[in-house]
Amino acid sequence: MPSPSGPIALIYDDDAYVEPAAGLMGRQVAGGAFLDAYLAHGRWDELVALVKSVDRVESLKRICREHPSSRSRARRLRVVEESRFLEDFGDLPPSRLIHAPGPPEAKHAWARHQIGGHGFALCGLTHTLASVAAIGRLRDLLIAPFQPYDALICTSTAVEATVRAVVDDYASYLKDRFGGDPRLGVHLATIPLGVDTDRHRPATVEERAEQRTRMGIGEEFVVLCVGRLSHHAKAHPYPLYRALDLAAATTGQPIRLVMSGWAASTGTAEAFRRGARLFAPRVVTEFVDGTDPAVRDRVWHAADAFAMLADSVQETFGLAVVEAMARGLPVVATDWDGHRDTVVDGETGLLVPTAMVRGATLDSGARLDLGAVDYDMYLAEVGQAVIVDIAAAASTFAGLIVERGRAASMGASGRRRAVAEFAWPGIITRYEALWAWQEGERSAQGGPIGPGVGGRHGPPERVHAAYPSRWLDDETRVVAAASAIDRLASLLAEPLTHHAAGRRVSDPSTLSGILGLAADPTRAGGLLAALRSRSVGPVRAAATLAWLLKYDLLRLASVTEEGG
């Protein structure tokens, strides 16, 4: 199987890969699982971490250091700060592929455009696709200078359809407005989220008995939900409560619903509890702390079935569904977003039909764009227009309760499917195959090309070209001011005159040498060449020359000084 011909650069931030103490999000669970799997199964010896600042990488260093794979493999972690992106990813990038924990970012495509050439490829994956920011990132794929060798990983076919719908709508607008034939500029690849099938495995007889005893469960049929308690951003609980209550009435069997989750506020948590009492009086509902990893891990052992009746456009995949399959549990899920890719209806679980009323959300996107509603209210408004077939859900639950053998058979089929299709070793192999394809496509491009024209934020010397009295060039004659070398040290020591110093040379001996070369009037181009001979890049060299002129260490040579 092909693999990238060098290290990948991972855009790293704790928010994308580390589970927080509070406010846990599905994307963080998925990000942490990906990182663990890439450490365990990736065929690499060096990893580049692209970070906002070096202090943001300490957790990654710890994760790499403590990971079991580090005991048997010598690996190198290289850290690159984003503030040095143009320099480090210029002539000889430390990596030929940059992977983001979300859709690839336009700023990196624009940076590549400014650098010129095809020095690296960009890759990223989808999570939520409903927010203003997410929609903006998708539109950027159409108008930013992305290349055909860049890639967006869609976690399901429904997600890919959403991406195409957003991009196609925007392309139609651009075509109507400007003409031409705007098209999506990146490659779309469908790769699902993965699951650790060693950690997420069926409970032993002993584990099941112990956990059910711990929870005081007898012969009840236990339906488990794992995830955020969010009626607008995850799953409204009413369809589940109502369906289970109807199933209890139909079968006459005791049912226990276990909600292993966490809520954004005590008000939301209480609303879920109150709803269970009101809408599922025949069902014993228990809430357990889903923020505790140990509790969240053990609670699976007590379950007979897993339920996820998602009805939010915030959802894209539903990782907990795949975890449930890996645990050998039959899944009852809505026929919604990525669920129809993960659950084989009638084989590994059952899909409950959903519907929406055309026209009910026609102005919702515009209301969000205008700020008439915030994102949470937008999700709530749209969610109120999503219908889950409660009668079908009730019939589904009743069937599993009555036919325990069928439920067990579905659970076993789900386990086999999880191992075959969603286990991390295979998913990482698919990632590496995609990255290898990207590298092949990128390296097949033509030779070096110059910096591209235009840009999201053009160079000030072009944007503000009309501001100064004149522009200096290589032929401009300059000369060191009197006592320049004597004044240099104080100017370097004073914050008022030495701020933004990272963009230029600050070494006193180098600067003194340049001033010495200008003891007599000389070409500015000669001083720039002298700086470049000291391995100073062209931008830093020009910025250094500008600083010397700004603080009267160099002056524009007059006719008198030229001897005229």
Protein language model annotation of sequence segments:
Residues 370-517, 521-529, 558-564:
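C-terminal amphipathic helix plus adjacent low-complexity
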Residues 290-293, 299-303:
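Short alpha-helical donor nucleotide-sugar binding micro-motif in glycosyltransferases
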Residues 330-333, 343, 350-351:
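Short hydrophobic beta-strand element within catalytic cores of glycosyltransferases
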Residues 147-207, 217:
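Donor nucleotide-sugar binding/catalytic pocket of nucleotide-sugar-dependent glycosyltransferases
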Residues 1-93:
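N-terminal pre-catalytic "stem/leader" segment of glycosyltransferase-like enzymes
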Residues 301-316, 329:
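Acidic donor-binding loop of glycosyltransferase active sites
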Residues 57-145, 555:
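Extended catalytic core of nucleotide-activated donor transferases of GT-like folds
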Residues 196-290, 473, 477:
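Conserved catalytic-core segment of nucleotide-activated headgroup transferases in glycan assembly
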